[in-house]
Amino acid sequence: MRKGEVLKLGIVPYMEGKEIQLKAFERVKKGETDGILILLQHPPVYTIGVSGGFDENILVPLAELKKKAELYKVERGGKITFHGPGQIVAYPIFNLAKWQKDVHLFVYKLEETIIKLLEEYGIKAGRKPKYTGVWVGDEKICAIGIAVRRWITWHGIAFNVNTDLSYFGLINACGITEFGVTSMQKLGINEDIEKVKEKMVDKFSEVFGIHFSEITLDRLAVIDNAKA
């Protein structure tokens, strides 16, 4: 079985989270581990991926949007989405050479991870033709936006546990106008987010065939500095 590391954090500012991803990326690139799974939450922030759609997917004046949350353009695929407390953001920094060099398969497995996680709570979720992510009926519960460099993945998924969904009302999330968003809480499941994280790690391990050892942020920094 592949060997990886998991880093569980609390609420981390978006740009700080990006720096953590880059440190993890370097560790994976050096072959020190097959993959690092980072789990955290962000303060309220909107991010816009490389597919753009900036003007048509923001439904309020830009100044009003920026009063509600930070706004960044980022390297992942996709259009605009929201991150905030109550949402688990998972950044799998995986070397696909250890699996298959197939980005579509990787995305499929990310979706499968969340579908299996929701099964644990009695929620029937699935995929929707033409769209990425995980859906419950016509509402998206998990968005996916990744980037790949040298067959190593970064960015990842955003899974709504008890997110304040009103933030999504200011945008066309992922550029989608005809469907909405949901969360575990909206579906009647009130679970502690740390418990959901634990189950998510288990499902990542199951779907990707990887055993995780937990590390701390300090440990990651020490490793990064030692190899610099």
From Swiss-Prot:
Enzyme Commission number(s) from the entry: 2.3.1.181
Localisation per UniProt entry: Cytoplasm
Note: In the reaction, the free carboxyl group of octanoic acid is attached via an amide linkage to the epsilon-amino group of a specific lysine residue of lipoyl domains of lipoate-dependent enzymes.
Domain called BPL/LPL catalytic: residue spans: 31-212
Catalytic activity: octanoyl-[ACP] + L-lysyl-[protein] = N(6)-octanoyl-L-lysyl-[protein] + holo-[ACP] + H(+)
Active site residues of this protein: 174 (acyl-thioester intermediate)
Alphabetical list of InterPro entries matching this protein: aa-tRNA-synth_II/BPL/LPL, BPL_LPL_catalytic, Octanoyltransferase, Octanoyltransferase_CS
Pfam families: LplA-B_cat
UniProt keywords, alphabetically: Acyltransferase, Cytoplasm, Transferase
Organism phylogeny: Bacteria, Bacillati, Bacillota, Clostridia, Thermoanaerobacterales
Protein name (Swiss-Prot/TrEMBL): Octanoyltransferase
Site (Lowers pKa of active site Cys): 140
Task of the protein: Catalyzes the transfer of endogenously produced octanoic acid from octanoyl-acyl-carrier-protein onto the lipoyl domains of lipoate-dependent enzymes. Lipoyl-ACP can also act as a substrate although octanoyl-ACP is likely to be the physiological substrate.
Pathway per the UniProt entry: Protein modification; protein lipoylation via endogenous pathway; protein N(6)-(lipoyl)lysine from octanoyl-[acyl-carrier-protein]: step 1/2
Binding site for substrate: 76-83, 143-145, 156-158
PANTHER family, sorted: LIPOYLTRANSFERASE 2, MITOCHONDRIAL-RELATED (PTHR10993:SF7), OCTANOYLTRANSFERASE (PTHR10993)
GO MF term set: lipoyl(octanoyl) transferase activity
A GO-annotated cellular component: cytoplasm
An example Gene Ontology biological process: protein modification process
Primary subcellular site in the record, as a coarse category: cytoplasm
Family: Belongs to the LipB family.
